[in-house]
UniProtKB/Swiss-Prot annotation:
Keyword DNA-binding: yes
DNA-binding positions: 368-388
Main location per the UniProt record: nucleus
Residues recorded with modification Phosphoserine: S42, S63, S249
Taxonomic lineage of the native organism: Eukaryota, Metazoa, Chordata, Craniata, Vertebrata
GO cellular component, one term: nucleus
Function: Repressor of ligand-dependent transcription activation by various nuclear repressors. Repressor of ligand-dependent transcription activation by ESR1, ESR2, NR3C1, PGR, RARA, RARB, RARG, RXRA and VDR. May act as transcription activator that binds DNA elements with the sequence 5'-CCCTATCGATCGATCTCTACCT-3'.
Protein's recorded name: Ligand-dependent corepressor
Position of the Glycyl lysine isopeptide (Lys-Gly) (interchain with G-Cter in SUMO2) cross-link: K254, K414
The organism of origin for this protein: Mus musculus (Mouse)
Region (Disordered) residue spans: 1-147, 299-348, 393-412
GO MF term list: chromatin binding; DNA binding
Sequence motif: Nuclear localization signal, positions: 339-345
Length: 433
């Protein structure tokens, strides 16, 4: 965009002012044009030769038309508050003598008033290696003096290390042998790497770096060194206090343990039945309380733990009181040595709820899908149980058929002991099969 504007300005001035000298110095972008000549360095000549261009310049002084050879010389003066990090050298970087070029003198005129110590050829203010007043002033003189900035920085860091080593020895003598050991370790760390040093060491060197020249000797910095060592002493006393607290007495920590099943629930099987009685407010368990205990608290983790021993206790009841009919589950078999643990979400239902759902479906009160939505039993499991009881399975298991035949004469005795009518109805249906 700048190039187009410059070309337009060059063409306009070449058409209007044909009396200008074409051999006048021009920018590198407009050298291809033979008759191109931008605005001259003297504004009086531009106003006398080209009144239209003078009006444009008076209307907008910051426009790209104002980029001339004169402005390119004083270009660093416009970047007073900007830190130039480019690798190119400014026109005044090569001049190291006291007499500067006009471009360099304009930077000091437009910027902040510099001190006479800044015009020294080595860029230093005192003999101990203190850098210029600020980093911005150092870059304003050019990157030719960048090598002189690195050595004073190392020198200032060395000064801060010497001051801190003196204060460490004095504080270590007051703290005792443990303090000597701690301070010695910290001193080794501070000498090994720059990243291992605390923040206040660099702040001390930065204060020395950005000082106004009054702090030129080590003897001028005892107060600052003491202040810089004070937060270190406070930090170390805080750490020592924490160590004493850690070594004083063991603290009771609650460590979370991952456990699948609490074995203490097995010894308290009687408490499982009193759990629902506390919830329902009655001492005896009814069929409704068992149903609510198995269906409703599925979301709670405590009820998840209750589901395992609860079903085991109900299976133990069934094995002691006797089963009116065999089931396909291994849990219901009295000959099984140990009841099988429930696996997955499809075994989170209770066996009593399963029996009630099977009896409701077999009596014709509900369909399989309706019983699935109400009792929370999977459709395939409920359908298989119903077909197994009705004898409509295509491939009935041979082992279950043998158990049914062996338990056939004992069913009549078990019916009298069973108080539920649903179990009696299902037992009669199994006898008819």
């Amino acid at each position: 965009m700048q190039r187009m504007i410059q070309q337009f300005a060059a063409e306009y001035t070449s058409k209007t002012s044909s009396t200008q000298d074409p051999s006048q110095p021009n920018s590198t972008k407009n050298q291809s044009l033979p008759k191109a000549s931008p605005v001259t360095t003297s504004p009086t000549a531009a106003t006398t030769q080209n009144p239209v261009l003078s009006k444009l310049l008076m209307a907008d002084q910051d426009s790209p038309l104002d980029l001339t050879v004169r402005k390119s010389q004083s270009e660093p003066s416009e970047q007073d508050g900007v830190l130039d990090l480019s690798t190119k050298k400014s026109p005044c970087a090569s001049s190291t003598s006291l007499s500067h070029s006009p471009g360099c003198s304009s930077t000091q005129g437009n910027g902040r008033p510099g001190r006479p110590s800044q015009y020294r050829p080595d860029g230093l203010r005192s003999g101990d290696g203190v850098p210029p007043r600020s980093l911005q002033d150092g870059t304003r003189e050019g990157f030719g003096h960048s090598t002189s900035l690195k050595v004073p920085l190392a020198r200032s860091l060395q000064i801060s290390e010497e001051l801190l080593s003196r204060n460490q020895l004095s504080t270590a003598a007051s703290l005792g042998p443990s303090g000597l050991q701690n301070h010695g370790q910290h001193l080794i760390l501070s000498r090994e790497a720059s990243w291992a040093k605390p923040h206040y060491e660099f702040s001390l060197s930065r204060m020395k770096f950005r000082g106004n020249g009054a702090l030129s000797n080590i003897s001028d910095l005892p107060f600052l060194a003491e202040n810089s060592a004070f937060p270190k002493m406070a930090h170390q006393t805080k750490q020592d206090g924490k160590r004493d607290m850690s070594h004083s007495s063991p603290v009771d920590l609650k460590i979370p343990q991952v456990r699948g099943m609490d074995l203490s629930w097995e010894s308290r099987t009687g408490d499982q039945y009193s759990y629902s009685s506390l919830v329902m407010g009655s001492q005896t368990e009814s069929a409704l309380s068992k149903k609510l205990r198995a269906i409703l608290p599925k979301q709670n983790r405590k009820s998840m733990l209750d589901a395992g021993p609860d079903s085991w206790g109900s299976d133990a009841e069934q094995s002691t009181s006797g089963q009116p009919y065999p089931t396909s589950d291994q849990e219901g078999d009295p000959g099984s040595k140990q009841p099988r643990k429930k696996r997955g979400r499809y075994r989170q239902y209770n066996s009593e709820i399963l029996e009630e759902a099977i009896s409701v479906v077999m009596s014709g009160k509900m369909s399989v899908s309706k019983a699935q939505s109400i009792y929370g039993i999977p459709h395939s499991t409920l359908e298989y149980k119903v077909k197994e009881r009705l004898g409509t399975l295509k491939n009935p298991p041979k082992k279950k058929m043998k158990l049914m035949r062996s338990e056939g004469p004992d069913v009549s005795v078990k019916i009298e002991l069973d108080p539920q009518g649903e179990a009696a109805q299902s037992a009669n249906e199994s006898k008819t099969e």
